[in-house]
């Protein structure tokens, strides 16, 4: 029972701790099967909150565009983006990623980019996830993202993760054992 819902929900890559193209992965990342069609969002179960997050497939959750916690997380990430840039400028070690909206086949998903550098108001990097809304883009593909389009950021140091505000919201959808494992990694 899958149904496309126009505009009401947004897909979020849920890769706790951040995917890493250079090998330092915290364990929950898996390649996602893609097709030329957009991912379908399941209907709410009978009696369930119609605005509640919905698992689409492994590591992909759909959040309603009016989800207050997710929108607050994106706002906090945007407000603290200068801290991310300062960590980069100061040479703080770690894997740097930013989340941004990626549109293909008329569908938008929110996906991570592993940062390689900055070019003015743009961030250079490589897709850290396999997109689910088509095959135009591939994990590892080089891209540039406008700083204004960044919805979240993370610096993953293995034993500590800075930022990751949307990932923190997504933790609420994980089983308790997994959630506890990742919650202790996040720092402000």
What is the role of each PLM region?
Residues 2-112, 116-188:
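Mixed-charge, low-complexity intrinsically disordered regions
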């Amino acid at each position: 029972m899958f149904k496309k819902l126009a505009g009401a929900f947004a897909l979020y890559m849920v890769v706790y701790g951040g995917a890493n193209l250079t090998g330092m992965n915290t364990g929950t990342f898996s390649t996602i099967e893609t097709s030329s069609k957009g991912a379908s969002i399941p209907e709410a179960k009978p009696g369930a909150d119609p605005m509640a997050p919905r698992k689409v497939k492994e590591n992909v959750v759909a959040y309603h565009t009016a989800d207050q916690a997710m929108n607050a997380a994106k706002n906090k990430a945007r407000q603290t983006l200068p801290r991310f840039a300062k960590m980069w400028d100061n040479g703080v070690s770690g894997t740097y990623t930013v989340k941004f909206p990626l549109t293909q086949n008329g569908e938008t998903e929110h996906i991570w980019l592993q940062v390689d550098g900055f070019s003015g108001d743009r961030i250079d990097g490589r897709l850290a996830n396999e997109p689910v809304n088509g095959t135009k883009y591939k994990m590892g593909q080089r891209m540039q993202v406008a700083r204004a389009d960044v919805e979240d950021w993370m610096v993953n140091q293995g034993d500590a993760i800075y930022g990751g505000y949307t990932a923190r919201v997504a933790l609420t959808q994980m089983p308790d054992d997994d959630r506890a494992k990742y919650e202790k990694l996040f720092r402000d």
